[in-house]
């Protein structure tokens, strides 16, 4: 059976439930943060000696990339997220559902991307709340969606190394 003749049930689109779960968890956490935490550094909750909960607005991309710009980046990142989501969904449609590693990676990225797009469209910014630091250095605040995007991307990169190792050597 060729990949193009897979039924929806046989294809990787079966894994979109994971993207939906990530999206729902991300939006739920962000709503809880917005409704229950004061905005900004003064209202942080110190959890561990290297970790705070901190409600901030991110007008840029992951880890505040381009957040200091004048607003054009909101639509750029929204457009990129739509293109990437469409591309990954297309690849999931062509992959068998049994290719768990890649389908999980794609679903994590899709769920995170859609969560951040939702924020950009509804609020005009992305809600970030995780603040890790060492001494006086603080990693830019981020959220669950950013985390799942990074995990999915790391899985794709790792899969590239795995695929190279399992390929037969040519003489």
From Swiss-Prot:
Q: EC number(s) per UniProt?
A: 3.4.23.36
Its pathway is: Protein modification; lipoprotein biosynthesis (signal peptide cleavage)
Pfam families the record matches? Peptidase_A8
**Annotated compartments:** Cell inner membrane
| One GO CC annotation | plasma membrane
Q: Which family does it belong to?
A: Belongs to the peptidase A8 family.
| NCBIfam families associated with the record | lspA
Please state what the protein is called: Lipoprotein signal peptidase
Taxonomically, what lineage is the organism?
Bacteria, Pseudomonadati, Pseudomonadota, Gammaproteobacteria, Vibrionales
Gene name of this polypeptide: lspA
């Amino acid at each position: 059976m060729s990949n193009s003749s897979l039924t929806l049930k046989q294809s990787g689109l079966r894994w979109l439930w994971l993207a939906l779960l990530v999206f729902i968890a991300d939006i739920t956490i962000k709503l809880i943060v917005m409704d229950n935490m004061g905005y900004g550094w003064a209202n942080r909750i110190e959890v561990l000696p290297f970790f705070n909960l901190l409600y901030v607005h991110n007008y840029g991309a992951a880890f505040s990339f381009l957040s200091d710009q004048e607003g054009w980046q909101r639509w750029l990142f929204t457009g990129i997220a739509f293109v990437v989501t469409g591309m990954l969904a297309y690849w999931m449609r062509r992959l068998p559902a049994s290719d768990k590693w890649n389908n999980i990676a794609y679903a994590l990225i899709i769920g995170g991307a859609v969560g951040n797009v939702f924020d950009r469209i509804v609020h005009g910014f992305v809600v970030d709340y995780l603040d890790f630091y060492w001494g006086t250095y603080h990693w830019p605040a981020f959220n669950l969606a950013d985390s799942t995007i990074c995990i999915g991307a790391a899985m794709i990169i790792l899969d590239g190394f795995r695929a190279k190792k399992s390929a037969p050597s040519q003489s």
